[in-house]
Curated annotation (Swiss-Prot):
Keywords: ATP-binding, Cell projection, Cytoplasm, Kinase, Magnesium, Metal-binding, Neurogenesis, Nucleotide-binding, Phosphoprotein, Serine/threonine-protein kinase, Synapse, Transferase, Ubl conjugation
Region listing for Leucine-zipper, in residue ranges: 459-480
Motif SDGLSD hexapeptide, residue range(s) on this chain: 874-879
Protein's UniProt name: Mitogen-activated protein kinase kinase kinase dlk-1
Domain Protein kinase: residue ranges: 135-377
Predominant subcellular localization, coarse grouping: other
Gene that encodes it: dlk-1
Gene3D superfamilies per UniProt: Phosphorylase Kinase, domain 1, Transferase(Phosphotransferase) domain 1
Modified residues annotated as Phosphoserine in this record: S874, S878
Subcellular location: Synapse; Cytoplasm; Cell projection, Axon; Cell projection, Dendrite
Active site location: D246 (proton acceptor)
Tissues expressed in: Expressed in nerve ring, nerve cord, neurons, and pharynx.
Outcome of mutating S878E: Phosphomimetic mutant. Enhances self-association and increases binding of the hexapeptide motif to the kinase domain
Amino acid sequence: MTSTTMVTTLDLVTPTSEEQPGPAPESSDFSTVVLSPDGSELVTQSAPNTPIQHREQANAEFGQKEGSPDPKNMVAATGNASKPSLNSFYADGLGQLRNGLFSCFQPVFGYFGTKTTVEIEKSEDELWEIPFDAISELEWLGSGSQGAVFRGQLENRTVAVKKVNQLKETEIKHLRHLRHQNIIEFLGVCSKSPCYCIVMEYCSKGQLCTVLKSRNTITRELFAQWVKEIADGMHYLHQNKVIHRDLKSPNILISAEDSIKICDFGTSHMQKKMDSTMMSFCGTVSWMAPEMIKKQPCNEKVDVYSFGVVLWEMLTRETPYANIAQMAIIFGVGTNILSLPMPEEAPKGLVLLIKQCLSQKGRNRPSFSHIRQHWEIFKPELFEMTEEEWQLAWDSYREFAKCIQYPSTVTRDHGGPKSAFAMEEEIQRKRHEQLNHIKDIRNMYEMKLKRTNKMYDKLQGCFTELKLKESELAEWEKDLTEREQWHNQNSPKAVAAPRAQLRGYPNEGYDDMSSDEDVQPCRGSPYRCSNTSSSSGVQSSPFSRQSSSRSSAGQQTRRSEGANPPKILRNDAIRHSGSYWETLGGARGSPARDSGFSQDSGMWSAGAGSCTAINGGGQQVCYSQTLYRNGDGRWSDGRIASRRRVSTSVNKSTAVPGQPVFFTRDSPSRVPHGVISCSSPRSSSKLNRSSYPSRNAPHQLEDGCCCAHARAPRAKSIAVPMTSSSRARSPTPYDNDFENAESFVDPESPKNLKNLEKIVNLPESTSYDEALCNSDVTMNPIYTSPITTYSNPCHVELVDEENANDVDLTSSMDSRRSRSDDADVESSEEDEGNGNNILNTSMESEDLRYRIDTSQSTMMSSLERSLEIGATRSDGLSDNEMRVQAVKMSIKTHRRTGSNPQALIHQCIDEYTTSATDDSDDAGAVRI
């Protein structure tokens, strides 16, 4: 029967022979059988595949461009028939230009009011996501393998809500663009936990299977319409490359207008290739194609097989393969031993279409485009019957399906009806799904209730805070009003007085000055650098505390406390600009900071000898005198004898036998103030470093000479032997007679040359007591008088100064050096050349000029006294390193006040602390 039907439906087409001219027969679009080239056998061709979408669109566009030809006016094709048309060529070129080049200007369209593609997609995404809260009046309709279905209201529209179990089941964005009258419309999805659901169009009449079983009568027109609409909907899906894979009567809905709506695309597949692909095992086995059951490569023809099962179901109104176990269906359909029997009285065209769709091989199944064409051919056969005959025949088809007998080995419950246990399980499953959905809805509303309560608490707190602020604002306004009223009542009315007019002043901007003490005199002004307070036309002299306006020769009292003292900064350029004291620098001990000749500073009044030079304007220029730590009354009353070394032959030639030499802190060798020049080369030994005090490096003074405008190197220390003619008392500036001043000025005087010949090396002393024992008996062991000398810095001649008081000059400058530095000196080759003179330091110079200042302090604090004891009794080798380091840091960090000045060496000192294990004073380095 099957073979006969297949032969009758095929058209036999033979190739036209040249010897037998005649009209060529029309070829069919369906499966054909043609003769082989030799004519010996027939070749069967299967039905062509479903035309893909782009080919159909191309054919439609080509037909629109060229126009449909009239069969009556067709002519034979000429030789140029294969040549493409120029119109289509240019049209295709313009289309490519429009889609290629002009597509670059699409983002610019947004500036002119045209929506871009991104904006459109964004708005679609926002509309696609529907919050579950927006759906109201949910009503349970039923449940299936993928979830329960509810009916609800969304924006005054009845919608169907299908609740799914997983989030990935809501990913159907590839289906939202589907718009067809026979395809269910998807409105959006809910992808927020806990309710994942799909919102779609609602069909009031329900599923097709339900309608078929519930309605006793269905007209033949309605039956033919439903078949055509199902084919049209599936054809639209295949055109959009969508394979349903689960087409069955429960997934076909009936709308209120009795229109077919294909739904449930949960198992749909987006076809990306023309070739057959391996698909997963999904769908219901009763409607499943054999190739899908056997997991063979398949294509869109699997939906054609399912469509054939749906046609059989519509014809018989019975469930296919009823009461057969699923595994039996899978095995029977897969091995082609189980099939759906056809009623004998059914229309032949409908039966033929069903059998073609149920073919085992997918290539033998027609496409939906061919199905639509064939249905139009078979429909007249259906309308040959009357309505009554149709109803009787339709009922008979149902009875035929009920009487189908299957082997008892494959039926459930051995062919009997469903057992009560199976029915109870199905009811429990449905009830369980309903309860799960109710539970999810309850959880969702509980979460919403919590959010609502939280928002209410926040609003309540905001209202409370707002009321509190309102009360505070009202109280503040009330207080402000009361204060304004009180102010207006009690405040006196002020009347502005006219500005006082000063007469007799050429410039009204000048202020009246009562005395010279109320003025801030600038540096170099006549108020600071002259004997009188009147201004003069001569060049102003540099200001110092020894000048005529501040010393005993000038004003005798200091400025009152109310007057602001002039600020002296550390910057040398600001502190010493425009003065003769460029050689003195801005260090502590400069004339602007440490003069001792003011009446209340603890120093003696300066005599006429302190002003030995006369400037070009006729004014006396007074020079500063440095205040040393060894001054009378200072915090270091004694002198610390430095360690001695055995003099070498170089120094022995100049030393006086039997006369020990010492360096005291008030020695002129320590702080020479004269303008000097040193040509000694810098040593290349390891002692050539910036540690204080340096023994080999000829340090450069920071102070430049104002006359020569050059930097002078610092003078080196010179050891002077003590003589028996040294005085035991502390001299005063009045001891300086004119003769001594005269000898000071004359560098070639015999007396100065005699004193210079007494320069010898300091013998090594291991302690302070030994140094005192080696000194002269007539010498004061506690105090050595400072020697006051004077020199004009403008005098560029090299002058050897004389000890005006006939006192031997000693120094303990290097007494604080450690033995580690002494060991370094012994290993130095340069020290061997200098005779291992420990005092052959950077203060040695043959062009040395002395300027020594005397000072006496009037205040000594307890802290200074304790530091003095620690400094005098320490030789740098103390075992307690922490205590020594503490003493050093105390000395370095101690601040001196104006009443307790401190003289410093005229150089810029940058002190920093190294590790605590340093015994030497190199921890406080001196950088010049």
